[in-house]
Design a protein with these regions (language model features):
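Active-site histidine-anchored catalytic micro-motif
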Residues: 1-147
């Protein structure tokens, strides 16, 4: 049976389009797992937030929300809002485009991310939120018999 380690992260967001770098926390979960090689999955429960990778720098932190706005603009009618009257139909659409999870392989206990690639959480709801992020690490521990 493959070992599984789960860690939960608690986040608070201030506004729509908050982007938070989770790379350090995910790497820490890999280290805490004691596993040598495998995959780390990062997942956000809910339908108005997303997990992805990006070069986490100020320019892209502004560009990414603007790109999402083109796919799901504020100024159109969303059927979701007619049903729920919560004004966040666009939040659900954006979140479904980006997705709620990401899996990253690791080797020798280190995430195999590119030099300019960070794991980020993206808040897409229209109000501040408390979020729980689930990091699940699966893999193999290094053994002396491995060659």
């Amino acid at each position: 049976m493959m070992p599984v380690f789960t860690k939960r992260l608690e986040l608070r967001t201030d506004a729509e389009n908050d982007i938070l770098d989770l790379t350090g926390e995910v790497q820490q979960a890999v280290e805490e797992s004691g596993l040598d090689a495998g995959v780390a999955t990062v997942f956000v429960p809910g339908s108005t937030a997303a997990i992805t990778t990006i070069e986490f720098e100020p320019g892209l932190a502004r560009d990414f929300p603007r790109m999402l706005e083109r796919f799901a603009p504020k100024d159109i009618d969303y059927e979701h809002q007619k049903a729920w009257h919560d004004d966040n139909g666009r939040s659900h659409v954006k979140a479904s485009l980006v997705g709620p999870s990401l899996s990253v392989p690791f080797e020798d206990g280190i995430l195999t991310l590119g030099t300019w690639q960070q794991i980020v959480f993206v808040e897409l709801d229209i109000r501040p939120r408390r979020r729980e992020i689930v990091v699940q690490v699966m893999g193999e521990a290094e053994t002396e018999s491995r060659s």
